Amino acid sequence: MSQNRPAAFNTLRMGEVIREKVQDGITGETRDLQYTQCKIVGNGSFGVVFQTKLSPSNEDAAIKRVLQDKRFKNRELQIMRIVRHPNIVQLKAFYYSNGERRDEVYLNLVQEFVPETVYRASRFFNKMKTTMPILEVKLYIYQLFRALAYIHSQGICHRDIKPQNLLLDPTTGILKLCDFGSAKILVENEPNVSYICSRYYRAPELIFGATNYTTKIDVWSTGCVMAELMLGQPLFPGESGIDQLVEIIKVLGTPTREQIRTMNPNYMEHKFPQIKPHPFNRVLRKADNNAIDLIARLLEYTPTERLGAIDAMVHPFFDDLRNPSTKLPDSRHQTGQVRDLPPLFDFNRHELSIAPQLNHQLVPPHVRPTLAAQGLDIDHFTPMRKEDMLARLD
């Protein structure tokens, strides 16, 4: 275990190198890691995130440092070691270090560094008195759904989807989901806490106190993020838990008794003010029919009525991304330059096994020869068994 105190990061002298014995993020094998030049780039109730440079490669990395309760295994570490996906931030290594107090132990997660977030990108367009270009909304939300389709097929629910947890490389347009600090493998008939997820993005069943919720809470959150990127502000800006429900009702209208039953049957007898829905095309005035249709299918009161992540990926809203001639304009610098879209269809066998009946919609014709050359011919495809796709913790 490292003797470096958490404060050591803040007192690094220029050019000073810290050496750690770390465990590899994939294999768990012990190896040496050296890094230098640390600066704090984020902190919260969980701990601190430092940006650092790995030595001698000079590669940027992020180190997330959290206080570890010795009585429990760290769920975030367990899940980060399981997930491997182009749209999920990669765990490079991890190690433990002592804190200021004798009994304090910190877990340090060494992850790839991604320079931007969707939250900051959205604020950039706000300052320019405009909203994010719709092609970028499509690009980011599609990649988020791709990450969710993958983790949901493993039984993992992220439980804190919000713009701040969506990392972005503005030069490539690649999105990576981060912060699995609230993530959990959901097991049927095992209760889960309802007080998770950041307020503006909380699914109504969570506000109703449900403990038997599903991965569809992440789908609701994604609908909220998508609408926010199109609006330039949160769709449901509640000031408290119950006010959050009021904001949702102002748009979706009062849920029916049946809808309330699907969220939490214990609330059946509550009397809610009767409010008519406010159509999405009036809330999102600039949105086209495909955008409106998708958001309406994501923001359903009844969890089972919401689209699954993989179903959302094949929605016509994302058809532009499947067109091989679509290019990504540089919206930040207004140079008039365009670039290729990042890889969006480099699916592996696991991803193609999630909903094999959708593969012909999922994989555009121009990509099929590339996948076939890797042994993934969607016309002659044997999917993995669902149980083999589920994540299992030690």
UniProtKB/Swiss-Prot annotation:
Location(s) in or outside the cell: Cytoplasm
What EC number(s) does its UniProt record assign? 2.7.11.1
Q: Where in the chain are disulfide-linked cysteines found?
A: none
Pfam families in alphabetical order = Pkinase
* Primary subcellular site in the record, as a coarse category: cytoplasm
- Annotated residues that bind ATP are located at V41, G42, N43, G44, S45, F46, G47, V48, V49, K64
Q: Which GO terms describe its molecular function?
A: ATP binding; protein serine/threonine kinase activity; protein serine/threonine/tyrosine kinase activity
Q: Cross-referenced Gene3D superfamilies, in alphabetical order?
A: Phosphorylase Kinase, domain 1, Transferase(Phosphotransferase) domain 1
* Upregulating conditions: Expression is regulated by MPS1 MAP kinase, particularly under stress conditions.
Q: Does Ubl conjugation count among this protein's keywords?
A: no
Sequence similarity:
Belongs to the protein kinase superfamily. CMGC Ser/Thr protein kinase family. GSK-3 subfamily.
What this protein is called in its record is Glycogen synthase kinase 1
